[in-house]
């Protein structure tokens, strides 16, 4: 089945501590999660490793978020939207359900 949310899509968070925030999808995981730029930041404590050149400390990075908790952002309407699929010229394309425009 084709993915409704893909890498480089702009999404909006629907639930959780970052509700209402927007960001670009950097990774889509096979477990049904996505990593969004600047969303769901967690602090990770790392040990120094001189062999790898890693300095120790507290690093802030993005954690994965469930794909059901984000929706694709429609720039035409300025709101979250749903995605559908249809065939155009023999190719499967994604479109916004609210206005029928193609995604990207």
From Swiss-Prot:
Keywords: Ribonucleoprotein, Ribosomal protein, RNA-binding, rRNA-binding. PROSITE patterns: RIBOSOMAL_L24. CDD domains: KOW_RPL26. One of its GO terms (molecular function) is structural constituent of ribosome. GO terms for biological process: translation. One of two assembly initiator proteins, it binds directly to the 5'-end of the 23S rRNA, where it nucleates assembly of the 50S subunit. One of the proteins that surrounds the polypeptide exit tunnel on the outside of the subunit. This is Large ribosomal subunit protein uL24. It comes from Shewanella amazonensis (strain ATCC BAA-1098 / SB2B).
